[in-house]
Amino acid sequence: MSSRVRHAEASPRPSWLSSARFYEVYPQSFADSNGDGIGDLRGLTNHLSYIRDLGCNALWINPCFDSPFKDAGYDVRDYTKVAPRYGTNDDLTALFEHAHTLGMHVLLDLVPGHTSEEHPWFQASSRPDPTERVTTVDADRTLPVESVTPVGQTTPRIASLFDPRRRGSDCETSRGVVQESAIQESVSDRYIWTDSWISRGDGLPFIGGETERDGTYIINFFKCQPALNYGFAHPKHPWQKPALGPEALATCEAMLDVMRFWLSRGADGFRVDMADSLVKHDDDGKPFTIRTWQYIFSQIRPEFPEAAFVAEWGRPYESMQAGFDMDFYLDWRWDGHPNGYNMLLRNTDTPLEHEGDASYFNADSGTSIAPFLEQYLPQLHDCERASGTFNLITCNHDTLRTAQRLTERELKVAYGMLLTMPGCPFLYYGDEIGMRYRPLPTKEGGYVRTGSRTPMQWDADKPNLGFSCAPSESLYLPVDSAADAPTVASEAAREDSLFNWVREVLALRTEQPALASDARFDVVAAPVDGRVFAYIRTPAEGHAPTHPRTTADSSSAPAPAATRDDVSDRNGATGRPLLIAMNPGRGIETVELPSELRPDASMLLALGSPTVSGRTLTLPAQSFAILG
């Protein structure tokens, strides 16, 4: 296997990602259209114009597939059926169509590593008689039926009956004649089963005594989530199948057919849950999981070249090799040790409290941006040389909302940065109005995450803040009952609100080629002993992606860089380099304007009255500026 794989030579990254600005929606908490207390797809469709007008042109919808909801939909019972509480498959198709008319793209949330224990695959796989471990499926939906070996591959691929070229007649394969209407397939090895009811999991979490099958089964997370079988890196027991072996490839093909099902109906791609966890006992660097994804992408990309895939992986050197278009800078903190992203917004062991928070954007922390850059820049470099994107989030469904511990002014500075950095920005629903985390009892396996999943707050003059007309006791989760709970209506009406600041930043990002996801990024100022952070973004057109500067220098003087002329954007207009600068602290900071910035550069966006005198930008306390 090559040490570095780029699928872009055969299939470029989806063109629309260069200008993508994502909005993450937790469907059960966004908008309820039928009054049952749970958000649904029609409610989301009715609010697509709101998301577009906010400045986002792409959606990530958390799982909306049929599920018993023991883990909020990350326990899938049927990958090709919308959960009835959200609506129907037709409702989701209508959402795709309406989004596309608005110039928006939609990513679904794919959970490839496990299913619900109620999935028909698992129900069949758990039967005691091996001959009964089969499922019957429509021939145009799923199922591997024959082994073929593509040119250049030593492992067989499993052909899919989804291929329309195969429909319309009976197919004779190495496994017999298959009727066009439905076929049966064995799912005995669709999951990872040991060979005895007393067997343990070889270091992996396992469940025994729950089924009639003589064996225990491996789980990924909760008890209700049996792991799908993508094989083992180094099998050492008979029940452990090899990665990319026939059993693992059959699982790959089943998941490919899930992708095909929704992509053919209008989805524009997938955010992939726990993308790095497919192959068990994988080596450092995840080489077998990487090869598995390379195989999957080798099949799906020729069919859907504009489909985008973002990994929940968090290590772009690996995810880019695997073939993903995007990775997230995930928010992690282990035993008091923050990662770079955590240093920005949640650098504390008591995340609900402002005091003692050493986050960069806490005005009183006194911390520098340099430690963040030390971790961020090498990972950005990994993405850039693979022509992928490394995405920053404001928050997501798994993290605590930042508005609980940062003030509105601190959030404005933070979002100014997060929405102008390289990669595609991901805005979590409600963050634009400063929705707060609320300590709540666990719901559907949410535990501490539950408080970040509360209903969207639309209008204080409407029942349940406009989320639903259902009785309050019927709501999926309670709305914020505080008298000062922010709503879209209240924040839109307040000129200096966080909501209007986010709209301004996103509007500028929409207009400026220098703020595209693939525009060049160069650090200008990041002193170890200061609070200022400044960087220049240069439109990517006309030059190959280049490496950002990798030093967080101890002085605030700009690092040297070649002077650049205006660069033409996609529509033939000119796009100038932009300087983005911020001071989240309490003192005054200065930045020397870099040579790339035109002498006639103007202040395009400002917070806190920054000023320019000659070639010096002065940033008062808690200020932010974009010049270009």
Model-derived regions, located:
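Beta-strand-rich binding/interaction modules
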Residues: 587-607
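Conserved alpha/beta catalytic core and glycan-binding cleft of carbohydrate-active enzymes
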Residues: 117, 123-124, 133, 141-146, ...
